[in-house]
Amino acid sequence: LDAVICSEVLEHVDSPQESIEELIRVLKPGGILALSVPRYLPELICWKLSNEYSKTPGGHVRIFKHNQLKKLGTINGLEYQNFHWAHGLHSPYWWLQCLFWKTKEKSFFVKQYHKFLVWDLMKQPLLTRVLEMILQPMIGKSLVMYFRKPI
C-alpha cells in the first residue's frame, strides 16, 4: 500500500509493537504511515476524572507520550516526517463524559456538548474553525504522526 492510516487504535491493543510491524509489512517502500492516538495530557485528564474510563472493556489500555509514539516508529526503521494535533474542540467533550461517567449520554452537559460538536462538524462555521486551530496546540485530543518507510 502507498499509504496506511492507523487512527485511534494503538491505545487499545495489547502489543503496539506487533501492530506496527504489521502496518509496516503492508506498506510499500517509500510509503507513508499515519498514526493517531489520544494525546497525553487530555487523555491523562480523562483517566484522572474517571476511574472507570481506563477500565472499560476494549477501551484505552495505555497513554502515549509524543516521544513514545515517535520512538515506536523509528525503532522499527521508519523515518519520522512530522506531527500535528487534532480535535481541539473534542477534549472538553471527553472530560464531560468522564466527569459524568455514570450518566454519560443522559447528562445534560454531555448531550449539549455533543450537539455542539455535531453542529460544528456539519456547519463548520468560521468561528469554531478558528477556535479549533487555537485550541489544538493546547488541548487537541489527538496526536497525529507521520512516518515514511525507507526505499
Where are these regions (language model features)?
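Conserved SAM-binding loop
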Residues: L1-C46, H66-G73, M145-K149
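Short, flexible active-site loop motifs that bind/organize anionic cofactors or intermediates
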Residues: V9, G59, E79-N82
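Short, solvent-exposed loop/helix junctions and linker helices
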Residues: V13, I63, P137-M138
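Secondary-structure boundary/capping signal
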Residues: Q17, G31, Y53, Y80-Q81
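A generic fold-level signal
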Residues: I32, T56, M138-G140
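A C-terminal cap/extension of S-adenosyl-L-methionine-dependent methyltransferases
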Residues: K48, Q81-I151
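Acceptor-substrate binding/catalytic loop of class I
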Residues: N51-Q68, W85-A86
